[in-house]
């Protein structure tokens, strides 16, 4: 789902140069890139706005060897049979016969045994306490990140810091609320029981049931029960962001079996990852929201069940989270070694440039840099040279999705695919990478970049079998030649590409008249590029100037994050930046990205307005693929259709995170597939004392 597409969008687009929806474990759903756009982690989310640069995207991890059984659970047999685990409770009539386990994965086999003591990538002895201060940009006016209205405070959902491309690890739900399952940073689309003690999936996938931990509590001491889970599901589907309705459509009904068991009944053919999606939904306190209108912005700190509570705030300016010493789950295997900071504080700044200066001054402790130019030229200051600030390129092995200039096909100007293709031909990535991004990026060539799901070469026979039913509606070139993008020498001499773009525009019914590109009625082609932060202007203006050479009038408009969110929520734009974040195994987020239902749902991530029979059919094929081979085939076929329909102008990507921090912290030595998870870090008292003293002395 999209817990704030605007920020997601930004993150994406900015990834390379200069936007939760939470998804299945490590899927990287919400959600973006180099200089940046709107995916898949709240509305104006802090770090998200900190800059989208052409550069980043992570994904999940490798599962241990074993039979690829869709939905297989940790501790269960491949057939998922067996009785309830000790203390799990008894299944009532109608939901018996399912294997019981402590974790679940979409494809493959979970790595950890039922009695695992803690995640292998954490430091189980990490000290607790200390403070970390982070930066957010823009402002906020709500503590409800699950609805369209209002701009939510950062830190309520998703990780503490947003990574480029909307990817990253650490709290799929967040730190105030918790979910039934906790995803593993080190496995692909795999999560383990947290609020639940065991999970059961019917052999025929007709239901998924969660047996709850009887000790689960909200921060005010109220017990967390199955009724809270059921109420949350119904409320999110009814009043939450459109993505919830889309992703949860495969549930036919929800029932509670006693106080500690919740059963989700699934429709035939439901999304393969739906059990995981359900397990990663937040669980909200039914009693606390009673009498409150859930569809309205929330101005008071909510009650949660997570490791942190909101201890103080200045609405729109700052918010502080304090670790709850009585947190009920602090000794669970899924919690040990995580959530180590005693206090996490967010200070809000006008934009990314101001936030960077605050970091240099020592007012902010850690920063994820999404602007390539800034990373190359803006981190040469005394604290870096003295070793007080550490600057690191951290590699990840995650799918990076797609980032680009997305075109709103609801607008007449972009309804014609020939026009959209011409926009792609006119974009000189090589010049931008050389002159704007310091050569730090590579071209985005797939909606599943940095993943085996990316389409390459010509369609293989198994892909053709999926594509053939839609052949009449697809470009012939899709079947005849590999997808390519223009490549220049990077010197700005792109006349051949502009000639080709002009030829496409002429085929679309335009012609040049008095140095203007006009249609048959003599109207000049004109449109606006909408941006959420002035940081992105430096990547938009050169593109706009190139388009003016074709006689197109392009206006670059910058609005504040809240207005950007509103405009994109209601699809009131021509072109903007967008990042589609993906994971190793696509989940129901792709329906929110590209389905017909999402095209007409206010606030969805389907900014282009895609409603195409081939896309619709291939989304279904991806979501119902029974094994990795068929998943790969379906995803590659879908990738080809999206590329050849030219819904966006591909920008850039990278497999590194640019992160700088004041040398106050410790972190596990083990490298993560996701690259970076701040939840596993801690304040190192010795380092912090030295660095803080140097900062006070003006270091």
Language-model features, listed with the residues they occupy:
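Extracellular/periplasmic solute-recognition and catalytic clefts
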Residues: 253-255, 311-322, 347-411, 421-422, ...
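Aromatic-rich, solvent-exposed beta-strand/loop patch
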Residues: 193-204, 219, 224, 265-284, ...
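Ligand-site clamp/hinge motif
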Residues: 209, 213, 296, 329-379, ...
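N-terminal lobe/hinge region of extracytoplasmic solute-binding protein
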Residues: 96-203, 234, 301-303
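Detector for C-terminal structural segments
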Residues: 136-138, 314-319, 323, 424-485, ...
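Aromatic- and charge-enriched surface segment that lines or borders ligand/interaction sites
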Residues: 122, 126-127, 147-165, 198-242, ...
């Amino acid at each position: 789902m999209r817990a704030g597409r605007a920020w997601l969008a930004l993150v994406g687009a900015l990834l390379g140069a200069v936007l939760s929806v939470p998804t299945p474990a490590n899927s990287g759903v919400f959600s973006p890139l180099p200089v940046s756009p709107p995916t898949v982690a709240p509305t104006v989310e802090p770090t998200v706005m900190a800059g989208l640069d052409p550069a980043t995207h992570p994904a999940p991890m490798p599962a241990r060897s074993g039979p690829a059984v869709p939905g297989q659970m940790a501790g269960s047999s491949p057939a998922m049979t067996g009785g309830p685990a000790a203390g799990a409770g008894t299944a009532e009539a109608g939901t018996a016969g399912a294997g019981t386990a402590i974790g679940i994965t979409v494809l493959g086999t979970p790595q950890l045994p039922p009695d695992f003591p803690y995640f292998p990538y954490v430091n189980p002895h990490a000290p607790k306490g200390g403070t970390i201060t982070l930066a957010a940009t823009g402002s906020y006016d709500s503590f409800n990140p699950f609805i369209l209205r209002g701009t939510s405070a950062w830190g309520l959902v998703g990780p503490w810091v947003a990574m480029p491309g909307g990817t990253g690890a650490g709290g799929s739900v967040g730190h105030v609320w918790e979910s039934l399952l906790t995803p593993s940073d080190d496995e692909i689309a795999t999560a383990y029981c947290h609020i639940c003690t065991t999970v059961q999936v019917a052999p025929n996938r007709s239901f998924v049931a969660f047996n709850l931990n009887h000790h689960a509590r909200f921060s005010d001491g109220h017990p967390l029960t199955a009724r809270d889970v059921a109420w949350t599901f119904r409320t999110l589907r009814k009043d939450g962001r459109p993505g919830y309705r889309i992703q949860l459509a495969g549930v036919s009904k929800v029932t509670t079996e006693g106080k500690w068991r919740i059963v989700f009944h699934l429709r035939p053919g439901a999304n393969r990852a739906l059990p995981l999606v359900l397990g990663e939904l937040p669980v909200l306190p039914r009693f606390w929201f009673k009498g409150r209108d859930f569809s309205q912005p929330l101005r008071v700190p909510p009650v949660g069940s997570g490791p942190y509570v909101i201890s103080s705030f200045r609405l729109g300016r700052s918010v502080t989270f304090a670790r709850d010493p009585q947190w009920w789950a602090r000794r669970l295997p899924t919690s040990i070694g995580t959530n180590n900071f005693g206090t996490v504080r967010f200070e809000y700044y006008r934009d990314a440039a101001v936030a960077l200066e605050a970091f240099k001054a020592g007012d902010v402790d850690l920063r994820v840099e999404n602007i390539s130019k800034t990373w190359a030229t803006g981190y040469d200051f005394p604290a870096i040279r003295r070793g007080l600030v550490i600057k690191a390129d951290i590699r990840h092995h995650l799918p990076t999705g797609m980032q680009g200039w997305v075109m709103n096909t609801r607008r007449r100007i972009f309804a014609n695919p020939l026009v959209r293709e011409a926009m792609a031909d006119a974009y000189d990535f090589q010049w931008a990478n050389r002159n704007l991004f310091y050569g730090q990026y590579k071209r985005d060539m797939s909606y599943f970049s940095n993943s085996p799901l990316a389409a390459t070469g010509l369609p293989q026979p198994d892909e053709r079998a999926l594509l053939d039913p839609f052949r009449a509606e697809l470009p012939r070139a899709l079947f005849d030649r590999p997808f390519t993008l223009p490549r220049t020498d990077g010197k700005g001499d792109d006349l051949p590409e502009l000639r080709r773009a002009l030829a496409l525009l002429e085929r679309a019914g335009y012609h040049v008249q008095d140095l203007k590109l006009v249609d048959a009625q003599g109207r000049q082609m004109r449109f606006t590029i909408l941006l959420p932060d002035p940081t992105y202007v430096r990547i938009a203006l050169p593109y706009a100037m190139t388009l003016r050479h074709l006689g197109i009038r392009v206006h670059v408009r910058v609005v504040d994050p809240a207005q950007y969110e509103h405009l994109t929520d209601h699809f009131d734009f021509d072109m903007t930046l967008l990042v589609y974040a993906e994971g190793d195994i696509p989940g129901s987020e792709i329906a929110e990205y590209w389905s017909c239902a999402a095209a007409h749902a206010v606030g969805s991530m389907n900014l282009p307005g895609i409603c195409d029979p081939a896309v619709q059919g291939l989304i279904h094929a991806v979501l119902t693929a029974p094994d990795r081979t068929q998943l790969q085939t379906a995803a590659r076929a879908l990738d080809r259709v999206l590329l050849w329909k030219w819904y966006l102008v591909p920008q850039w990507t990278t497999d590194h995170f640019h992160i700088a921090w004041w040398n106050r912290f410790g972190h596990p030595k083990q490298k993560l597939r996701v690259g970076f998870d701040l939840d596993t870090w801690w304040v190192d008292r010795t380092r912090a004392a030295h660095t803080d003293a140097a900062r006070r002395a003006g270091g």
